[in-house]
Structure formats: C-alpha cells, structure tokens
C-alpha cells in the first residue's frame, strides 16, 4: 500500500468522523503559508503540495491577515514564520486566534525553550523548527480535526444549556400563564384576545423572574434630593413613602429609600454624639475658646495659687488688683491698710518684674515671665507738703533700710521667691562688692537718703506727713502701709505693691526663714542713694533683728544718720501709731480664698524654683524700678 492510499484511507475516516462533505481528507486541505524568506517559502510550498494540500503563499504578514479577513471560510490552517519585518508572528497569531479562530502553526529556526513557550502561550497549536521535514507536514491535519471536535463539543454544550434554559422558561411561562389567566379574567380586552394577552403577560413575568434587579447607586445629586425631601418633611416625620413621592425619581423603590434613610439617621446621631462630647470636654476643662482647651488642662494648679488664665497683658486694671488691696478682707487682716484708696499711676515703662509672690500675695492678673519696670508717680498734691519738686521714693513696708552714701545712682533690686504661696522677698549676694558693707535686718529696700534739688529747704529732719497726720520715722512708716512714690511729675499716690503683708499661720506651720543681702540702687531725678541690707526674718514670730532707721535732714543731699532702734519684736505693744500684729493678724487661721489668686492675674508663670544649699527655695528674678 502506497503512502497516497494510506492517506486516502485515513482521510476517509477523518471525513466521516468530522462530518465534512469532502472525500479523502486531508487531501485538498486549505493551508495558508506566510514567510518573509522567499527560499524558505518556496521549499515549504513544495512540501505541502507533495502532501496534496491546497497551498496559498505570501511574504508579508499584513497581506496574510487581509486574506484571512476577506476569506474567513476559505482556509483550514495557517503556517507562519515567527520573525517577519512588517509584523511579528506572535502578533499575527493573536489576531487570527481572536478574529478567525483557526489553528496556527509557528515556524522558526530558533528552538529555545522560552521562544517555544511564548508561541504556545499565545495560542499556537504546534511549533516547527526549520528546515521542515515532510513527515511533520503530513501530520498537521490532526490539528484541524481536533479544533473541529472542540467546536462541536462546545456547540453541543451550548445547545444543551439552551435547551435546559428553554425548558425552565417554558415551565415558568406555564406557571405565569396560569396565574395571569386567573387574574386576567376580570380584565379582558374588548377584542377578546384573551390568549394573546395571557401569553404576553406570561412572557413578561417569566423575563422579570429571571432578571436581576439593578443596584441603586446614590449619587451626589440623588443624595441632595433625598436630603431636601427629608428637610422639607422634618427628620421626625420623614417616612420612606413621602420621601419617595417628593424625590420623584425613577428606578428607585421604597426599600431603597428606607435603607438610605436609616443610614442617614445613624449619620446624624453620630454627628450629635461627637458634638456633645466636644462640648462636654470644653465645659470640663473650662475653656471658652476651643483653641485653648489644652491650656485649660493646667487648671488644677489654681488650687496652689500657681497659674491662671491671662485675660489681658496690655495694662493692669485697678478694678482687679487695687480695689481688692484697698479692702482689709482681701488680705485676711484688719487695720493694716490706710483708709485712703490706693491709686496706680500711668505706667511709662514696660512691666518687667515678677510680682507673683511678693509679700505672699497671689491675686491679680499675671504676665508670663515678665519683669516689672515702671515709673509710679503720685499726684501733684503729694503727701509731703514741704517738697515741691523733689524725688523721694519709698516702698511701703515695716521698716526703713540704712543708708550707705549719697549723690549716686539708686538701683533697687528686689529678688523675690515664689517657691510656695507664703514666699517673701529673698535677695541674693551683692552684685557690687564695694557696696556690701551693712548687714542690718530689713524687709524691703526703702530709699530714704533723698536729695532736694533746691526747690525747698524746709523739709523736717525725720518727720514725713501723709494726708495730714504726722508720721514718725519708724512707727508711722510701719503702720501706715502707704508711702507715696514721686517722680519728676507728681501724678498719683501709689501704695507699694512689694510690701510684705504678714500672714497668719496655723500653729503647725514651720518657720520660714529668709536670708539674703540685697544691693539696691536707684536714680530718681538726679538724686542718688545707695543701700545694702540683708533679710533674716522668722515669719511666725514676725521679728525684726537689729532694725536700723535712717534719720537725715532732707536738704541739699546731706547724708542721713543711721540710728539703731530698740528690739523690733512685735508682740502686744499698744502704740497709738503702730499696729498690733499679733492681735490683728492672728485672727485668721490661713489664707483667705480671695488671697489665693494673688498676683496670678499679672504674671502668668512663675520663674523656675531652684534650691540653695540650705534648702531654702528662691527664684533668680528681680524687680527694678527706674
């Protein structure tokens, strides 16, 4: 048996198996050969003709694609080279597989595994290496039979699925027809086409039962209509049916509106919860402005008289501080303050002194970390009747400091301690070595060496007059608690803010001893006074050790004479011009509530407290009066 007879027998079986109309398959199989090399293309054509295939050749991939598109049913197999100039063989493979669904055999001289794998993954049914042999081309017909069998199976599966779907539709149509027949008996047409109507209704019901309801997407415009409808009805009276009527939108059901309304109510509830939580936090921290809520968290320090919110930092109002200082109840003592109200002159320099704990006071406004440097002036009608344009400067306190020299600049430096609410004036070592020559005990630096500029020479030696009553050098200055401070222009009478107000302690309170030496120096209207003193006081006993009182003639800059006093311990002395501290001050058992705030309204923050070697707290700050 020859090869041709064997091929004819196989072809006959193939034709009968494939159901084709041709005899002796694969004789006459239509093959399209594509190769850019004319020699290879000619050899391939001769081999295909020896296999009795119907061959069509072309040297360009674009031409081959054009032939396939024009004659879709005129070819059974495509043999294409991989590397071509106008189009890659893999690209042609993809296009043929997508558009014509024909088996494609790749032909190349490159037999690398990656190249072969690439051709197979792109849909090639076989990959042949050059030069092609006749035995390989004689068996290429099997790819055509395999593709036809796969198509037949797919068609059979599609037919079976279609028949099943048709059966289900028929059952649904029959069920729907029965229902519609019952319902359509009452609504028959005038023409009597009951059967047609029932069939149409059954078809519609069958289609609606199999179709899936479209999902509603709430766009921005749709949500705006929903919100407008809810606002029009009110959130309490809004129901899905009314909202749907007001929206007047197609393809939206009542269930869709009900679901969206539930989500919208949950959203509003969450917003109200967040707003109430923020309001509660703001109320708990006491913050009026939400930007300062974090600052209000330090409100617990108010119990210790340390910090308080600063209302303003521009100027000090007399209503906040001085009015409370005028009343004895503000300090918890009686009889200390003079009946005349305290007046504060206009500040000409910046406030730059920490007055946080001067004299144990903690009321008023606070200015953070500031040192007060201001010129306090008194009224033109001053309390010194014999001084017309002098420059006496005094600080209200219990005693006066001794004098060192005259006709020098006077710079008053008072170092304050604010380690606790019961802090008093604490100084530091003298900054000028040649000035530290006295160690007399005192409480507040008071310049008493005052040089008259020649305007009036009739000043008494040691007697000062304030508002009429005669004031003795020691007792009057100690008991009056009000000494004017005068500048070049007498504008206001000011009580010293640095006075140490004695405070009543509990019996369990340990003594607070403060020791320091202060070197002060002020310049007032070309009058120069030097003072250097130290502090050594026990507050519970309110004792003054070795007090010295300056006595001088206030004329032409003569130096005063420092005369020692008798023992300064104050117990139960009944002096007309001197206060009884133990009787008046021990009435209270602690700081009153009005004193706890102190000068916190002036200074926002205290300086950082440090510790000396002996454990006495102090603050390295100063108060400078220029």
From Swiss-Prot:
Skewed-composition ranges (Polar residues): 402-421
Positions of post-translational 4-aspartylphosphate modification: 81
Compositionally biased intervals (Basic and acidic residues): 151-162
SMART domains: REC
Chain residue ranges for the region called Disordered: 1-22, 151-215, 402-440
Example GO BP: cytokinin-activated signaling pathway
SUPFAM superfamilies: CheY-like, Homeodomain-like
Matches recorded under InterPro entries: ARR-like, CheY-like_superfamily, Homeodomain-like_sf, Myb_dom, Myb_dom_plants, Response_reg_B-typ_pln, SANT/Myb, Sig_transdc_resp-reg_receiver
PANTHER family xrefs: TWO-COMPONENT RESPONSE REGULATOR, TWO-COMPONENT RESPONSE REGULATOR ARR10
Protein name: Two-component response regulator ORR24
Organism phylogeny: Eukaryota, Viridiplantae, Streptophyta, Embryophyta, Tracheophyta
């Amino acid at each position: 048996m020859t090869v041709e007879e064997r091929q004819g027998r196989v072809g006959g079986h193939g034709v009968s198996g494939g159901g084709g109309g041709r005899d002796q398959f694969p004789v006459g199989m239509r093959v399209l050969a594509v190769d850019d090399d004319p020699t290879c293309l000619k050899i391939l054509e001769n081999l295909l003709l020896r296999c009795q295939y119907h061959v069509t050749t072309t040297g360009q991939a674009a031409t081959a694609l054009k032939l396939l598109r024009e004659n879709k049913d005129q070819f059974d197999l495509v043999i294409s080279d991989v590397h071509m100039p106008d189009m890659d063989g893999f690209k042609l493979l993809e296009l043929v597989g997508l558009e014509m669904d024909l088996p494609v055999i790749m032909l190349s001289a490159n037999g690398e595994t990656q190249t072969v794998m690439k051709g197979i993954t792109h849909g090639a049914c076989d990959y042949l290496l050059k030069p092609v042999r006749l035995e390989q081309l004689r068996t290429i017909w099997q790819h055509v039979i395999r593709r036809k069998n796969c198509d037949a199976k797919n068609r059979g599966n599609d037919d079976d699925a279609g028949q099943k779907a048709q059966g289900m539709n028929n059952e649904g149509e029959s069920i729907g027809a029965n229902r519609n027949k019952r319902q359509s008996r009452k609504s028959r047409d005038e023409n009597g086409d009951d059967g047609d109507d029932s069939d149409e209704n059954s078809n519609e019901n069958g289609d609606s039962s199999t179709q899936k309801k479209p999902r509603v997407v709430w766009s921005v415009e749709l949500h705006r209509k929903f919100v407008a409808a809810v606002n029009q009805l009110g959130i309490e009276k809004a129901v899905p049916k009314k909202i749907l009527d007001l929206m007047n939108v197609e393809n939206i059901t009542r269930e869709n509106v009900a679901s969206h309304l539930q989500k919208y109510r949950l959203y509003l509830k969450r917003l109200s919860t967040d707003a109430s939580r923020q309001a509660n936090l703001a109320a708990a921290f006491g913050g009026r402005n939400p930007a300062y809520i974090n600052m209000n968290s330090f409100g617990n320090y108010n119990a210790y008289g340390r910090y308080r919110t600063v209302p303003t930092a521009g100027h000090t109002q007399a209503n906040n501080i001085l009015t409370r200082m005028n009343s004895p109840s503000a300090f918890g003592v009686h009889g200390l303050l003079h009946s005349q109200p305290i007046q504060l002159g206009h500040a000409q320099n910046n406030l730059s002194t920490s007055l946080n704990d001067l004299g144990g006071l903690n009321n008023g406004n606070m200015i953070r970390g500031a040192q007060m440097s201001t010129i306090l002036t008194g009224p033109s009608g001053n309390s010194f009747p014999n001084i017309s344009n002098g420059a006496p400067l005094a600080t209200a306190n219990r005693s006066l400091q001794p004098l060192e020299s005259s006709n020098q600049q006077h710079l008053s430096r008072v170092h304050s301690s604010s380690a606790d609410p019961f802090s008093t004036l604490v100084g530091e070592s003298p900054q000028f070595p040649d000035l530290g020559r006295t160690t007399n005990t005192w409480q507040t630096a008071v310049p008493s060496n005052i040089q008259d500029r020649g305007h009036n020479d009739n000043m008494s030696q040691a007697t000062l007059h304030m508002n009429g009553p005669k004031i003795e050098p020691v007792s009057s200055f100690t008991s009056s608690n009000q000494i004017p401070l005068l500048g070049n222009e007498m504008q206001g009478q000011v009580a010293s803010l640095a006075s140490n107000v004695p405070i009543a302690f509990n019996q369990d309170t340990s003594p607070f001893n403060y020791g320091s030496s202060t070197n002060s120096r002020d310049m007032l209207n070309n009058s120069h006074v030097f003072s250097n003193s130290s502090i050594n006081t026990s507050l519970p006993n309110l004792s003054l050790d070795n007090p010295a009182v300056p006595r001088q003639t206030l004329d032409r800059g003569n130096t005063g004479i420092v005369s020692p006093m008798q023992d300064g311990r104050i117990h139960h002395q009944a002096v007309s011009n001197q206060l009884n501290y133990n009787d008046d001050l021990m009435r209270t058992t602690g700081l009153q509530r009005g004193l706890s705030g102190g000068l916190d309204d002036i200074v926002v923050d205290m300086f950082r407290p440090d510790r000396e070697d002996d454990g006495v707290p102090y603050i390295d700050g100063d108060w400078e009066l220029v």
